[in-house]
From Swiss-Prot:
It comes from Rippkaea orientalis (strain PCC 8801 / RF-1) (Cyanothece sp. (strain PCC 8801)). It is found in: Cytoplasm. Its EC number is 6.1.1.4. The gene is leuS. A motif ('KMSKS' region) lies at residues 617-621. This is Leucine--tRNA ligase.
Length: 856
């Protein structure tokens, strides 16, 4: 074998060889247990970043491990290829989105292949390909026919730069678009929605079926679904037959209601507004109308409101209370109205103080007898109901039930469960997305495109002049079609689908990616699903993961799959962070090449100013990124993989460190030299097991300890970093061992390479073949622990006198307490320190030490 480790040569060689062998193809007919390993597929931006590399390397190690452990493995890859960036690139560069996207996919695929990922590329999918989005459209129609897809007029978040609708999740807490950075506006449009709310309770309760998910992610979904148990109460409007309906989780406070608040958009707002207040109310509505929901409900923003002049009546006590409108009440949430209980709600208390509204105490602490205490803040804890008519003296927690029963009896309201989750708005006014397969007919209304006419393809003769209206809305030849039902002139839907639709089912397509007759074969999908290990970023905790769970349940109810949940286990890998330099005076980031270390400080090379330094997520704007191509070019894929796996536990953030990269490169070189030395000095005959020396047994123990520790590290939480540490320990044990003529040494070399194979697949394969094997190392079996090899024949016994260590001796691991004391006394150390001494007490800790207490 070559004396020097040449990563570039062996990696290229084996990547080509694995393709020829078809090593990464998914076994179709096998009796082996299945394992489906999947990384969240990328958007084809054109270049891999280190976050990508970490994600895909983690999944690849798991896939390779499971193959070695005897599983048939599905490990596919594809492209989340629709979306605004491609369309914006077409505008900026003057090239079609498809051309830009497919070029990027090709480029990124080559980059992924250089990492040595064991991906079955024959199952590659691209969501922008007609053969994929045909089935996205078909699945949409399944939901439409089931009543889960519908259109309605809705106030939406409008991005004025990208000229499209944004879901609430795509607007930040300051009211800006997550992608373009534009200030989001409110706009009334007819939009398509999916009834995810029909599955709210299932989505919530089935989180208990996911023990393999991080608690943090489950909590985020639980909060987003936002189940509230309470009551629906109605407040009559004075002088009207109308009533204001509110939802409350605190019916026990209803006697403390001193005002009600409507959303500015509420249909009753204009009806309750008096002529005197109309001008002010109209101005307020106009002011609020351009603010996003996120902006209006932000907790740190002052709440604004105005009196309408109207009055409501609290049916429980007959009191007249003012009606206001306020920005923090949203018509799309709940009933679009809330009751104000300032004495027992923090937000209401602050709002009432600002508006000089009455504050009425109806709950007091159990140990208090003051029924009208002065308040400096809202009292929100449980207590005793007061000033509440027939409910005075009742525990407030019991009062909730009592009030609801009374309301139902008197016709004031009823018990109700409400969810924060809203239906999923899927319309997008853009070109580069999956067309919604419906036609609007003046006679027939909305008509589904027949299955035989799918896919509704995106037209190619599109002119991109700027980010104004959707290009599809201008294409008369494409829009105008006969109605599929009556044959009369009709128009296509010009909105496209939210790209999260594409990614809500892609994992199912992988199970049968080349099927031209159906989205996926039911038998194949049910065979491979659910995904055994899913890997991706925490940023997808709510959107993608929740939508995919909804899709799976909806398709289950259509008889298309037989599972409740798509992802058994979820690993959310941490970010890759780079060393970042920043001028604290100007706030500007400084590239590393402009930084010098001088007088114990990092300084700007040009100005000499002291810079602050820290680790942050890699990005171009912070000049702290590391190009994977440069790392692979200098060290090779195996070194990059080893560093990423060793530097931090997978769920933690990883701080990039060139010195540690170099350290992993040195380790692989040591492994190379270790095998080269073994082959150079390999004996012609091997000792029999019965002839094993103590050194042989110690080495075998080190080998099987490594198998045990690494196997345990790679189950459960996938602690790759500690597994790599164990690989290093085994390598060191083999380097230090002198028993090359022993069969144990050969076992150690082979075991090291198989254990290394999932982490550094190229060097492991090369060295395996150098040992003389023809069959790929990746087709071997994961080593199993021999319990007998872990048994320790001898241990090191510490001898202490008065608690101080005086020496050690080797003793049998099975020696009794009496035998240990005897051996310690008879040892050279014992005789030297105990001769002529009066031993008062002997403390024996089996397997560790003997401590002699002597008289002073």
């Amino acid at each position: 074998m070559e004396s020097q480790y040449n990563a570039a040569a062996i990696e290229q060689k084996w990547q080509q060889d694995w393709v020829k062998q078809g090593l990464d193809k998914t076994p179709e007919n096998s009796n082996k247990p299945k394992f489906y390993a999947l990384s969240m597929f990328p958007y084809p931006s054109g270049n891999l970043h280190m976050g990508h590399v970490r994600n895909y390397v983690i999944t690849d190690v798991i896939a390779r491990l499971k193959r070695l452990q005897g599983y048939r493995v599905l490990h596919p890859m594809g492209w989340d290829a629709f979306g605004l960036p491609a369309e914006n690139a077409a505008i900026d560069r003057g090239i079609p989105p498809a051309e830009w996207t497919y070029k990027n996919m090709s480029q990124m695929k080559q980059q992924l292949q250089t990492l040595g990922l064991s991906i079955d590329w024959e199952r590659e999918v691209a969501t922008c390909a007609p053969e994929y989005y045909k089935w996205t459209q078909w699945l949409f129609l399944q939901l439409y026919q089931a009543g889960l897809a519908y259109q309605k007029e809705a106030a939406v978040n409008w991005d004025p730069i990208d000229q499209t609708v944004l879901a609430n999740e795509q607007v930040d807490s300051e009211g800006y678009s997550w992608r373009s950075g534009a200030k989001v506006e409110r706009k009334l449009l007819r939009q398509w929605f999916l009834k995810i709310t029909d599955y709210a309770e299932q989505l919530l309760t089935d989180l208990d079926k996911l023990p393999g998910w991080p608690d943090r992610v489950k909590l985020m979904q639980e909060n987003w679904i936002g189940k509230s148990v309470g009551a629906y109460l109605e407040f009559p409007i004075k002088g009207s037959e109308e009533k204001i309906a509110v939802f409350t989780t605190r019916p026990d406070t209803v006697y403390g209601v001193t005002y009600v608040v409507l959303a500015p958009e509420h249909p009753l707002t204009l009806k309750v507004t008096t002529p005197e207040q109309k001008a002010a109310v109209d101005a307020f509505i106009e002011e609020v109308s351009n603010e996003s929901e996120i902006e209006r409900t932000a907790e740190d923003k002052p709440k604004r409101g105005i009196l309408t002049g109207g009055t409501a009546i609290n049916p429980f006590n007959g009191q007249e209370i003012p009606i206001l409108i306020a920005d923090y009440v949203l018509y799309e949430y709940g009933t679009g109205a809330v009751m104000g209980v300032p004495a027992h709600d923090t937000r209401d208390f602050k709002f009432a103080k600002e508006k000089q509204l009455p504050i009425k105490v109806v709950i007091i602490p159990e140990n208090s007898d003051n029924t009208n205490p002065p308040l400096t803040e809202a009292y929100t804890d449980p207590g005793i109901m007061v000033n509440s008519g027939i409910f005075d003296g009742i525990q407030s927690t019991e009062g909730k039930t009592a009030i609801i029963e009374y309301a139902e009896k008197e016709g004031y309201g009823k018990a109700r469960i409400q969810y924060r989750l809203r239906d999923w708005l899927i319309s997008r006014q853009r070109y580069w997305g999956c067309p919604i397969p419906v036609v609007h007919c003046p006679s027939c209304g909305t008509v589904a495109v027949p299955d035989a006419d799918l896919p509704v393809k995106l037209p190619e003769n599109v002119e991109f002049t700027g980010r104004d209206a959707s290009p599809l809305a201008k294409l008369e030849d494409w829009i105008n079609v006969p109605c599929p039902s009556c044959g009369e002139p009709a128009k296509r839907e010009t909105d496209t689908m939210d790209t999260f639709i594409d990614s809500s089912w892609y994992y199912l397509r992988y199970t049968d990616a080349n099927n031209n007759q159906e989205a996926f074969n039911l038998e194949k999908a049910n065979d491979w699903m659910a995904i055994d290990q899913y890997v991706g970023g925490i940023e997808h905790a709510i959107l993608h993961l929740l939508y995919s769970r909804f899709f799976t349940k909806a398709l289950r109810d259509r008889g298309l799959v037989n599972i409740d949940e798509p992802f058994k286990r979820l690993l959310t890998q941490g970010m890759v962070q780079g060393l970042t330099y920043k001028n604290p005076q100007t706030g500007k980031y400084v590239p590393s090449e402009n930084v010098i270390f001088q007088d114990d400080h990092y300084r700007d090379k040009e100005t000499g100013e002291i810079l602050s330094f820290f680790y942050e997520k890699m990005s171009k704007s912070k000049y702290n990124g590391v190009d994977p191509k440069q790392v692979l070019g200098k060290y090779g894929a195996d070194t990059a993989r080893m560093f990423i796996l060793f530097k931090a536990p997978p769920e933690k953030d990883l701080e990039w460190d060139d010195a540690d990269v170099e350290g992993q490169f040195r380790f692989l070189n040591r492994v190379w030299r270790l095998v080269a030395n073994y082959l150079e000095n390999k004996p012609k005959t091997v000792k029999k097991a019965s002839e094993l020396t103590k050194e042989d047994k110690d080495l075998r123990r080190a080998i099987h300890t490594a198998i045990k520790e690494i196997s345990e590290d790679l189950e459960g939480d996938y602690q790759f970093n500690t597994a790599v540490s164990e690989l290093m320990k085994l390598s060191n044990a083999l380097t230090d061992a002198k028993c090359l003529e022993s069969g144990v040494y050969q076992e150690g070399i082979e075991t090291l390479l198989i254990l290394l194979a999932p982490f550094a697949p190229h060097i492991a394969e090369e060295l395996w073949h150098n040992l003389g094997y023809e069959k790929s190392i990746h087709l071997q079996s994961w080593p199993t622990v021999n319990p007998d090899a872990l048994v320790v024949d001898e241990i090191t016994l510490v001898i202490q006198i008065m608690g101080k260590t005086r020496g050690t001796i080797q003793v049998s691991a099975t020696a009794t307490k009496d035998e240990l004391e005897k051996l310690a006394r008879e040892s050279e150390v014992g005789q030297r320190y105990l001769d002529g001494q009066d031993v008062k007490k002997v403390i024996v800790v089996p397997g560790k030490l003997v401590n002699f207490v002597i008289a002073k």
